[in-house]
Amino acid sequence: MKLNTIAPAAGSKSAPKRLGRGIGSGLGKTSGKGHKGQKARSGGYHKVGFEGGQMPIQRRLPKFGFTSASKRYVAEIRLHELNGLALEEVTVDTLKDSGLIRKDIKSVKIIASGEIQKAVSLKGIACTKGAKEAIEKAGGKVE
């Protein structure tokens, strides 16, 4: 194989539409743009969301809610994810070291999703009522 012999697969490329090249082409005269109007002009189009002067939907509907910036630094961990850890004592730092949470996370909450088979001790980690019951049932403790 040589560089000058490389070609795309047969049928994978189509010839570009040749606009304004006579009636027989099917795209002559107005080149598929119809007659007159803003969209027929060169450079003529509207902004995204423009509705012809009518008040656009993004301005008709009210604003609501906001995103808390502190939420970015709180992680949720499911109960069954603790099974994969080779740790008896679980803290925020040990979770960071194991790669279960990002390094910039400041606090963690365990939620009762799935089951836990091993006894673990949680230190400085919040958990839901159901998760606490499951951890204590498995022989672990929450501090």
UniProtKB/Swiss-Prot annotation:
Keywords: Ribonucleoprotein, Ribosomal protein, RNA-binding, rRNA-binding. Pfam families: Ribosomal_L27A. One of its GO terms (molecular function) is structural constituent of ribosome. It comes from the Bacteria. GO terms for biological process: translation. The keyword Ion transport does not apply. InterPro entries: Ribosomal_uL15, Ribosomal_uL15/eL18, Ribosomal_uL15/eL18_sf, Ribosomal_uL15_bac-type, Ribosomal_uL15_CS. GO terms for cellular component: cytosolic large ribosomal subunit. Residues 21-31 have a biased composition (Gly residues). NCBIfam families: rplO_bact. Belongs to the universal ribosomal protein uL15 family. Part of the 50S ribosomal subunit. This is Large ribosomal subunit protein uL15. It comes from Francisella philomiragia subsp. philomiragia (strain ATCC 25017 / CCUG 19701 / FSC 153 / O#319-036).
